[in-house]
Amino acid sequence: MLKKWIPSEPVIHIDDSDVVKPDGYKFESLGIVRDGSESTSSKNVYKKGYHVTEACVLTGNNHPVSIFSRIHSSAEKDYKSANTITFDAIEQGTTLFRKATFAMDRGYDDNKMFLKLDELGQEYVIRLTAKRKLLYHNKWTPATELRDRRKGKIKTSVFYKGKDHEAYLSHVKVQITASRKNIYLVLVYGITEHPMMLATNKEIKSKEDVIKVARTYFSRWKIEEYFRCKKQMFQFENFRVRKLCAINALNFYITLCMAFLAMISMESESNALKVAIIKTADPVKEKVFFCYYRLAKGISGILSYAKEGVRLWFRTKRPAYRQLCLKLVA
């Protein structure tokens, strides 16, 4: 069923989040994680909790559906590394879709990541850090130097942090440190203080291809919103079970609920069920880019009327009338 929802060229976003349990003591393999909700660009806040690695594929209407979700901790007995979990997520995406485009943030600017994606024959759009060096004209050159030499010549609009922005794009052919394979460095000017640097092995033949690469990366805000929706609408961090296996089981059930929201979101606007759900949610805005919140609120509102469960909502099928038959033995 999932493949029916996905376009012919799948885009998979991989990102890490956290589940913090600052007052927890008895949870299994409880480690220390960076609290993303309280940390800023200038200050990191660390608390007790777990790491969450998620891989989401975008549906035909650009809503995320999870294909991989795992809660893990560096305090586990046989824990290897966060990269091992990320590789599992990439392999899961490769198994489901023979070829896809993986979009990742700066935390995945790692030679091992590029080599893994090349090994599996996958395409990628990965944002580079300021420390990255690239081979340009047979000379190792800092990516920041290539960025500062150029100016964006391609004008386009992109959606970033809840707003539409005008961006100016440029691209240059380079080689990555890991595999020495030819890739493109796509530069995005006019949005952040320092222009963004995106590495991609996707083929670029026109300015439309450059715009497509940039928009593929900027669509990753949806996986960030996906995490927020899980935490707010399903109280993701408010679990009470202690075993890591049980925590992952609860995470699996939430993932199924989020997939159901994705299924409802793809229905037409005239669909009776979708209309009833949105009407119950009573949203402030008529249209939004991310509709999971209102769908979850609407379904919760409908189910709140079920005081004795939903079993009584269905008409019971009575068995066929059977006449009492007595067999007399002579």
Where are these regions (language model features)?
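Single, function-defining residue in the core of a domain
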Residues: 6-10, 21, 25, 58-330
